[in-house]
Amino acid sequence: MAHSVPESMDPNGPIRVEHDRKRRQFSVRLNGCHDRAVLLYEYVGKKTVDLQHTEVPDAFRGRGIAKHLAKAAMDFVVEEDLKAHLTCWYIQKFVKENPLPQYLEHLQP
């Protein structure tokens, strides 16, 4: 599920999210390969993930990058038929603002 990533991030260009299953993270390369925005998760059960933390460097905030990370993580949860525990406040906010049925039915009660 890894996507190609542009060498540098054009503020008006597409944001591409990479999924590193081994490191259990979604990331967006910023400014070449030095800066990254990341969303970290852990498996807390066989079919349950804890979406723990989203971080975007200060210089890149306000551009919708965290929203792309949250969407990629929730789409992963749906595609893999997992349950999600939302520890990260930003992902809680994302799901509240985007209450899609496929997201809501995959939330851990």
Swiss-Prot record:
Top-rank taxon: Eukaryota
N-acetyltransferase domain segment(s): 18-108
Gene3D superfamilies for the chain: 3.40.630.30
Start and end residues of each stretch annotated as Disordered: 1-20
InterPro entries linked to this entry: Acyl_CoA_acyltransferase (IPR016181), Gcn5-rel_NAT (IPR045057), GNAT_YJDJ (IPR031165)
Family, similarity comment: Belongs to the NATD1 family.
Protein known as: Protein NATD1
